[in-house]
Amino acid sequence: MRSFGVHVAVPDELGSLARTLAVPYYDDALPAHDEFHANRVHDVALRLASDVDRRVKTGVLAAAAWLHDIGRPRERTDDIDDHVVWATRESGELLAAEGIPKADIEAIQHCIRTHSIRASSPNAETIEAKLLFDADKLDATGAVGVTRLACIIGERSGRSDERHAVIDDFTANRAVTADQDDVSVLRKWADERLEALHTEPAQELGASRSEYMDEFLARFYDEIGVEGTQ
């Protein structure tokens, strides 16, 4: 198994430009899909790129990482229907205005277009698109993933004005019942993403993060106890 130590990637001009273009779009983003999420995806994507046995266009990958979720704030407020479709188009226009070569723009757009785990998302065909997908999904695993997914539950609950899930375990003998998901939804969401990973380095990193989530949930169940009194 590879050793995943600290890896600092030096951003190239395309990645730096994309960051400058992307950051203002995240001003109204909620924590699960803000510029810090984009930054983590960027860093993990480049980390994975250094461990694949393929030549990776790191500029394309870095740019796509910064731009992939710029439509999230607008989708959340129903200003647009699909953040992926919107971000793909918007990114193309932004990069074209900066004189970026058409081939690079199309490569970045493919990464953005295929980064979602939604059933409607097309398959990632290039190594850059696969690495972006993997890095994005890994951000929903491990300690970061527990935090992000809890944020997403809060976001969805606020948007629907109904509890999306509760911080409890409905397998326990409770005096209350509910038809929402319980805390195990964190594990379910993470597993769906781990099973979809494309690259070997991502799968190895995902296995480590999965172990942490098992430890977290075990501690959670221990803390609430069967009757929630411990």
Question: What is the role of each PLM region?
Answer:
Residues R2-A9, A29-E35, R40-R54, L67, ...:
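Divalent metal-dependent phosphate-bond-processing catalytic cores, especially two-metal-ion Mg2+/Mn2+ enzymes
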Residues V41-H42, L46, D82-A96:
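An active-site-proximal "capping" alpha-helix that borders the catalytic cofactor pocket
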Residues L94-K130:
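Hydrophobic, well-structured mid-protein blocks that either form specific transmembrane helices
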Residues V6-V23:
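Short alpha-helical hairpin
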Residues Y26-A29, A49, I70-E75, L95, ...:
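Short amphipathic alpha-helical interaction patches enriched in hydrophobic/aromatic residues
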Residues T58-T77, H83, A87, S91, ...:
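His-Asp-centered metal-binding catalytic motifs of divalent-metal-dependent phosphohydrolases/nucleases
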